Amino acid sequence: VMNQWPGVNLRVTEGWDEDGHHFEESLHYEGRAVDITTSDRDKSKYGTLSRLAVEAGF
């Protein structure tokens, strides 16, 4: 993220879910999923952010 958008940080908004906010089969209940966004919350970056996550092995 820092190489793609200088000054923008990666935000992890949720990892483990114990409150039941995700669908029943969600990997959040196993600690194998995260919800991420950027510090500027610019939704136009989400496609590229997804690609970066896949390229990083997530």
Swiss-Prot record:
The keyword ATP-binding does not apply. Ca(2+) 2 binds at E14, D17, D19. The keyword Transport does not apply. The C-terminal domain displays an autoproteolysis activity and a cholesterol transferase activity. Both activities result in the cleavage of the full-length protein and covalent attachment of a cholesterol moiety to the C-terminal of the newly generated N-terminal fragment (N-product). The N-product is the active species in both local and long-range signaling, whereas the C-product has no signaling activity. Cholesterylation is required for N-product targeting to lipid rafts and multimerization. Its main location: secreted. Ca(2+) 1 binds at T13, E14. GO terms for molecular function: calcium ion binding; patched binding; peptidase activity. GO terms for cellular component: extracellular space; plasma membrane. Zn(2+) binds at H28, D35. One of its GO terms (biological process) is animal organ development. Keywords: Autocatalytic cleavage, Calcium, Cell membrane, Developmental protein, Hydrolase, Lipoprotein, Membrane, Metal-binding, Palmitate, Protease, Secreted, Zinc. It is found in: Secreted; Cell membrane. N-product is active as a multimer. The sonic hedgehog protein N-product binds calcium and zinc ions; this stabilizes the protein fold and is essential for protein-protein interactions mediated by this domain. Belongs to the hedgehog family. This is Sonic hedgehog protein. It comes from Pseudorasbora parva.
